[in-house]
Amino acid sequence: MALSMPLNGLKEEDKEPLIELFVKAGSDGESIGNCPFSQRLFMILWLKGVVFSVTTVDLKRKPADLQNLAPGTHPPFITFNSEVKTDVNKIEEFLEEVLCPPKYLKLSPKHPESNTAGMDIFAKFSAYIKNSRPEANEALERGLLKTLQKLDEYLNSPLPDEIDENSMEDIKFSTRKFLDGNEMTLADCNLLPKLHIVKVVAKKYRNFDIPKEMTGIWRYLTNAYSRDEFTNTCPSDKEVEIAYSDVAKRLTK
């Protein structure tokens, strides 16, 4: 006679959820592909410290079992205790609500401004990289630089909790590692994958570098590249370049 222990002797709230993340595969059909939304969820789950599995989905030959699991849905999506969830923003909210303290880290930023910092960069970058008219290039590059400058200023401006009101020292520049402090938050999971794409693609197809004078952005990227949560969820530079090979337009007269 088979005996079943209630949840292996664990209370419902103590049992690890069964989570599977499905992300876009790279050009080889197996490695991690270029998809900032896939990386965003990958980073969130990694930072939460929860056990989860990752499956890369080759969009060219999507397996039948995945078609049945999430019909008509492109990655990223997750299954959480066998329930399919497909909207990235809603998945983020759900994970933050369900995977909560004391067992899991809270990842919401303390400062609301961190959520919107750099939010317009990707749109300006897309316009810049998709443009094929040489006469429009300079203005579009200026537009991108303006949004990068705004992010740089935010990263270099001290947050309220960096300023000690009782100290005689006047702190003019922030030394924090990430958008909202010295730890990654949901805001970083959203922005960093996009900022990395901007850096790689603009260099490859426009020979554009983020100016070294933007010390806040470079400090931010350097700190991100030192973290497994970012580098191990990131597609290779080659994969990012391949993804944009048809999107990035040559400047032709």
Swiss-Prot record:
Entry coiled-coil feature ranges: none
Residues recorded with modification N-acetylalanine: 2
Regulation: Inhibited by rapamycin, amphotericin B and IAA-94.
Tissue specificity as recorded in UniProt: Detected in epithelial cells from colon, esophagus and kidney (at protein level). Expression is prominent in heart, kidney, placenta and skeletal muscle.
Induction: Up-regulated by calcium ions in differentiating keratinocytes. Up-regulated in myofibroblasts.
Subunit structure: Component of a multimeric complex consisting of several cytoskeletal proteins, including actin, ezrin, alpha-actinin, gelsolin, IQGAP1 and CLIC5A. Binds directly to brain dynamin I in a complex containing actin, tubulin and 14-3-3 isoforms. Monomer. Interacts with HRH3. Interacts with AKAP9.
Protein name in UniProt: Chloride intracellular channel protein 4
Organism per entry: Homo sapiens (Human)
Phylogenetic lineage: Eukaryota, Metazoa, Chordata, Craniata, Vertebrata
